[in-house]
Amino acid sequence: MAQPSNYWKQDVLPLSILMLTLVATECTIGIIASGIVMAVNAVSWVQKKAISITTRILLLLSVSRIGLQSIMLIEITSSIFNVAFYNSVLYRVSNVSFVFLNYCSLWFAALLSFFHFVKIANFSYPLFFKLKWRISELMPWLLWLSVFISFSSSMFFSKHKFTVNNNNSLSNNICNFTMKLYVVETNVVNVSFLFISGILPPLTMFVATATLLIFSLRRHTLNMRNSATGSRNPCIEAHMQAIKETSCFLFLYILNAAALLLSTSNIVDASLFWSIVIRIVLPVYPAGHSVLLIQNNPGLRRTWKHLQSQIHLYLQNRF
């Protein structure tokens, strides 16, 4: 979890309030977007009385993100208004839950990218063709395996201990507030275990599949352009849009993995600035990815627009 070493108390906390506002906005958008993804896919499951692989992954992904962003919202509020939160049993529970849900989110997004890559990409290799035929059988097992790995890795954080130095304080002249210093012990072995067990496998899978998918789409686009007769081709435009979306997903995923590593390993906790930046960056990926999923899916997009119109109508009647 985002664990900056400095937690402050004073009468007016403009920086704290600004950080809380930004994180709360990101988490609220993410929870609403993930809720829409979950609701639409759940309704589809009930109506069809069957669940596809994509629907199953999206349901798991949206549920994990709703839980994750709810914990982020609770944690950031508690850290600002109640320092004792970090010495409580509740903190350890929320810390383990935060890491577990973050790992699950990374794995589910990576498996979604892997599934789309296998279904969409076109490579003339026997092993790839065999994978295409068996991917639907393998995915449920891979999903359960990812949950098990996430849970096992997150248990490492259940024994996380803080060394609190109440006598030390730092003064920040720019923001004009006093900060109590909380030091978290960490070492290279812990950071290596954290990265290798929870972040590196899904990160490698996502980067590899997204990059190969972009390569496959670009190659197919070039072939269509060479054989195209008209000035505009809807298929080419669709491929270019898919390349842009996948590139955006890839950037957000790498950014989130880096922020998660820095957050849970306490590497940047000595810096107030970077601690705040990490806290603001962490909710960006789950919220941004969920919004992009909605924009790229006609059914989800219709539900999103309907919700926006309902909110706009409510605000008009209210004010």
UniProtKB/Swiss-Prot annotation:
Keyword terms, alphabetized: G-protein coupled receptor, Glycoprotein, Membrane, Receptor, Sensory transduction, Taste, Transducer, Transmembrane, Transmembrane helix
Cytoplasmic side: 38-65, 119-137, 216-247, 295-319
GO BP: detection of chemical stimulus involved in sensory perception of bitter taste
Chief subcellular location: membrane
Stretches assigned to the Extracellular side: 1-16, 87-97, 159-194, 269-273
Pfam family, one: TAS2R
Subcellular location: Membrane
Transmembrane segments: 17-37, 66-86, 98-118, 138-158, 195-215, 248-268, 274-294
Calcium as UniProt keyword: no
Source superkingdom: Eukaryota
Topological relation to the membrane, as annotated: Multi-pass membrane protein
Glycosylation, residue list: N95, N167, N176, N190
Gene Ontology terms for molecular function: bitter taste receptor activity; G protein-coupled receptor activity; taste receptor activity
Record keyword Transmembrane helix present: yes
GO cellular component: membrane
Miscellaneous comment text of the record: Several bitter taste receptors are expressed in a single taste receptor cell.
UniProt record similarity statement: Belongs to the G-protein coupled receptor T2R family.
Protein role: Putative taste receptor which may play a role in the perception of bitterness.
Protein name: Taste receptor type 2 member 39
Species of provenance: Mus musculus
Lineage: Eukaryota, Metazoa, Chordata, Craniata, Vertebrata
